[in-house]
């Protein structure tokens, strides 16, 4: 351990036994001193859900927390490890693309939680085609995403990236998905297409964007995260922690009339 190296807190939402977080921790070990604090089991799509108390267990990677990704960030920052210079969440199995996932994804929400502490953060996910889902992934599958993350972690803090961005949302294509190796700066797509159908006492929710992506039928413009990843690029979206506020004259009038 080098006292001059940055302290890096690593977490995820797929759980501490997922290959993506092991690949990430191994890769970031070349950048700084890594402490892993991650959920004991899968916490995908939990957003920023928070617990009051969580059980913590030793794990060969670090600490396994019986809680959410947001729990892990708070526990890691305030109780379990050295205070980090950077929080990195991932590598998620599957992309986190578009504006609508930012509040839903546990991977991204861990980065947002860190941002509220004023700690720079990176959320990283690996986009997979529909036919790749359901197939087990291995540590080696995450190499491209980890390479992109370590590149950013080396320079982003010292180069002032986080002077204007609270966190980065990184999406890298699966190495078998025609990856170009190019990294591009993007903005989250505003596309949204959820629907639901009822059968008896059950309502099934459908994300039609994933169906469209599988068919190659997307209309996201150049410069968006989804377009970049489907074109084989690594997408990096610099973001600020929600929620932004703007002055509204009309709302002032309504409030005054109350």
Swiss-Prot record:
UniProt region (Disordered), positions on chain? 237-258
Q: Which UniProt keywords apply?
A: Cytoplasm, Hydrolase, Metal-binding, Nucleotide-binding
Q: What does the record give as EC number?
A: 3.1.3.5
As recorded in Swiss-Prot or TrEMBL, the protein's gene is named surE
- Where is this protein localized, as stated in its record? Cytoplasm
Q: What does this protein need as cofactor? A: a divalent metal cation
The record's remark on the cofactor is: Binds 1 divalent metal cation per subunit.
What one GO molecular function would you report for this record? nucleotide binding
Write out the catalysed reaction.
Answer: a ribonucleoside 5'-phosphate + H2O = a ribonucleoside + phosphate
Q: What is this protein called?
A: 5'-nucleotidase SurE
Give the NCBIfam families listed for this entry.
surE (TIGR00087)
Entry function: Nucleotidase that shows phosphatase activity on nucleoside 5'-monophosphates.
Database matches in InterPro entries = SurE (IPR030048), SurE-like_Pase/nucleotidase (IPR002828), SurE-like_sf (IPR036523)
